[in-house]
Each structure stands twice: as C-alpha cells, then as structure tokens.
Amino acid sequence: MRVDYLKKLGPGLLFAGAAIGVSHLVQSTRAGADYGWGLLWALIIVNLFKYPFFQYGPRFALATKKSLLEGYFKMGKIYLWIYFIINIATMFTIQSAVTIVTASLASKVFGITPDLIIWSLIVTSICFSILLIGKYNLLDRIIKWIILALTLSSITAFLIAFTNNTSSLSFTQILPEGNKLIFLIAFMGWMPAPLDISIWHSLWTIEKNKNSNKLNTKEGIDDFNIGYLTTVVLGICFMGLGALVMFNSNLEFSNKGGAFADQLINLYTSTLGEHFYIFITVAALTTMFSTTLTTLDASPRAMEKTSQLLFPKNKSFNYLFWIIILSIGTSSIFIFLLSEMGKLVEIATVLSFITAPFYAFLNYRLVISNQMPEKFKPNKFMRILSVSGIIFLLSFTIGYLIKI
C-alpha cells in the first residue's frame, strides 16, 4: 500500500478507535466467558445489519461536503433538537464510563496510586491536552499508532491463548433465554458501537478533507471498511479470549467494566504465564485509551456543529467550550457521583440503545433523499440490507423494552 494512501487513512481508524472499547474489551469478552463461542452468530449478524448505517456517515459527508447533522437539520429541525437533547443526556456518563475503565487499567499497569479518581483525572487531562494542543491533525496521527498497537497486541494475545488451549472447542451456537436474553440484546445493541458514532465519522471526514490528504468518495468508503473490518476482527478476538481463557473457569465475573478487565488480565496471566502479561495489558489499555481519546474529541465536535445549526447567532458554543464542559462534567462525576456511576451508565446505555432505530432510519432516509447526489446513492443490495437492518434493530429494541 502506498505511503501517500496510508496518510489518507484517518476517519475510519478514528471510528475503530471509538468503537473498540467497552463493547469489545468487556462485552465481547464477557460473551466468550459466559457462552464460549456460542454467541459468535450474534456478533457477525449485528455487524452485518449495522454496516450500512455506519457507512452512510462518510458516504454522505464525501458526496455532499456536509455532515450528517447538517443533513438532519435540512430534513427537519426537530431531528437535530432530538439529537441535541439525547447527547446532552448521555455524553457525560458515557465519557465517564470509558474513562473509569481506562483509569482502572492504567492503575494496574503503572501502579503509582490505586486511587481511580486520581487516575481518571490524569487520563482526562492527557486526552484534553492532546486534543487542545494538536487538534485533529495530532489525533489523526496518534490514532494510527494506537490502532496498530491495539490490533497487533489483541491478535497476539488471542493467538497465544488459542495455541495454549488444551480443551476441546465447541462452536455450537446458542440463543439465550429468560433473563439471559437481556445480555444478548445489550451485547448486540453496543456491538460494534452505538449508531450515533456515524455522526462523529461524518464530522471527522469533513475535518480530514480540510488538509492536503483529501479523500474522495471511494477512498473514504475504503478507509471506513478498513476501520469496520478491524472492529469485527477484534470483536472476534476478544470473544475468543473470553472463550479460551475464562469460559468454564467456574469463577464469578464482575458486572463492572474495570473490575471485569482486571479479572481478564489476572486470569490470562495465571493461565498462560506472567511472560504473556504484556500482550493482554497493552491490548486492554490501548483499547480503552483509544475510546477515551476519540470520544472526548467527538462529542464536543458534534455539539459544536449542532450548536452552530440551532443557535447560529451564538458563536460561544464552539469546540473549546464543549470540550471544557465535557471534561469538567466528567471530572465532577468522578469526584461527586462515583458511587452512582452504575445507575448513570445504565441510563445512558438504555438511551443510546433505544435510539439506534432512530439513527438508522435518519441515515437511510438521508442517503436516498434529494440531498444526496444520484450517483452516490446506495445500490439495491445496500437498500435491502438497510431496510432489513432497520427491522432488525427495531425488533431488538422492542424486545429490550419488553424485558426491562
């Protein structure tokens, strides 16, 4: 692959960095720990049905030179107001959730202090500094190295676990029943990521094309496909780690992300040896740091654009304003509401999950509307997959609401 083409890669890797987080390290691994390879079908099918809606982010941005948010606004101001309210309701707790898992892993890897509040503030400060000093261009460069380290360490950790496995492997697929069905619904809802990340991707694509390494539509979709394939492969790797190292271990696993990640690392090293510790810790830490960094960039970027469209006369609601607000809000949750973190994350998770059909419908409607140039509209296969995906997401959302 040519060096100049590698320089053009960016938004798709940022997507991967944002997507490969709690959904992979915690939920995919948990699926493997509890069901072995039994939920592999769910991982594959949900990635298939969500694919078009994520892809429409860069497709629309490159074809129209506008973000999905601008498309929503043109379809109707009400859609943007809904997004604004949902984002305000979820962005602080989601940022806090990914940061606390990163802090837990950093505490384990670097020691210094076991205080998660201190580590959370350190992680937030590092990410804030990277984004404030280097802005998008530094983020674009850093994420390529993070994703490379993440991919190599995760695949290596999986291969080590696979080659050291002495138990027979079962690929019998399972459909959980009763209360266990709730885990399946949540797993599929967050794999590989909530659908509003398609909005972030469209904004990153617009930002990427402000520099000299501009993407055309084909290159942009190729860039996305590389990022998306990475999320799928690593989803399988983390499920495999759970299946190979944690399944049938007769241990009770924590429902808290940081504690579960700690259990994974401890069990991995105790099963395979201390000399393999570095591979699983690098995989886990880079997984969560990439999510923390990209999320801290994306939410303020999305809120800046939303504010520009909804409040055109107010110029103060810019990127700097929102990243400061998000950083302060996140830090405040660590300091004052850490004991309520579980409930706050649950609320944010439910809101993000039940809005998936909403974003799927909006993205599909947008790319077949007259806002989209005819030659860039999805083909027949993508349209069929999109309609099937909307039905699929709607069905699981209704199923989730019935069960809770």
Question: PLM features: residue spans?
Answer:
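Selective recognition of specific alpha-helical transmembrane segments in multi-pass small-molecule
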Residues: 43-56, 219-249
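Hydrophobic transmembrane alpha-helices that form the core helical bundles
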Residues: 63, 80-111, 120, 288-307, ...
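Flexible loop linkers connecting adjacent transmembrane helices
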Residues: 28-30, 55-78, 106, 110, ...
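Hydrophobic alpha-helical segments and their helix-loop junctions in multi-pass secondary transporters
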Residues: 148-175, 184-203, 359-374, 396-404
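Extracellular loop-to-transmembrane helix junctions
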Residues: 30-55, 70-74, 78-80, 182, ...
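Membrane-interface loop-to-helix entry segments
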Residues: 122, 130-161, 175-178, 346-356, ...
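Juxtamembrane transmembrane-helix boundary signature
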Residues: 15, 42-71, 82-94
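Transmembrane alpha-helical segments of multi-pass small-molecule transport proteins
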Residues: 12, 84, 109-132, 148-159, ...
